[in-house]
């Protein structure tokens, strides 16, 4: 809820856990694929197909066999991993899970260190406006940023604790 005044507003936050069945299906498919067994891969594909069917899309096998440049991608562990990661990025877009997925997959240092490009919105001519420029660069330092620092008080209380790398 919020109240608006002439110069300011106040907000109240109500945190609650939010998880959709789709997220659980995607996590389960990811876990099944990591087991690296043909039967598990088939089961993982069946869960992905349920998600795609809800969205009105064809299943993984039919889609990749028909439309992909790499029709055999879903037949290998690595290929299905890429498919699952892409499905997660699309299905859970703007829900706040991408950063945590990148950390879990250990790809954050690659993806988050890319330059963010955009148009020159201050340009006065079409040529200036549509010219691409770097807006900003993110900085994710591996392995440090995959872990959080252990609070100094905890290190003092328990001298057997060791600070995480980079902190």
Stretches found by the model and what they are:
Residues 1-167:
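Acidic/polar-rich alpha-helix caps and helix-coil junctions
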């Amino acid at each position: 809820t919020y109240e608006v005044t002439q110069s300011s507003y106040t907000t109240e936050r109500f945190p609650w856990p939010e998880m959709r069945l789709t997220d659980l299906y995607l996590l389960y498919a990811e876990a099944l694929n990591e087991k690296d067994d043909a039967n598990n891969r088939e089961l993982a594909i069946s869960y992905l197909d349920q998600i795609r069917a809800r969205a009105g899309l064809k299943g993984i096998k039919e889609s990749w066999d028909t439309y992909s440049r790499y029709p055999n991608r879903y037949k290998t562990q690595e290929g299905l991993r890429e498919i699952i990661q892409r499905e997660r990025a699309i299905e859970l877009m703007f829900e706040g899970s991408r950063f945590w997925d990148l950390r879990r997959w250990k790809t954050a240092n690659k993806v988050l260190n890319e330059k963010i490009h955009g148009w020159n919105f201050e340009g006065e001519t079409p040529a200036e406006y549509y010219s691409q420029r770097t807006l900003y660069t993110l900085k994710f330092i591996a392995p440090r940023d995959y872990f959080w620092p252990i609070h100094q008080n905890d290190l003092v209380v328990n001298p057997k604790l060791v600070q995480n790398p980079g902190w």
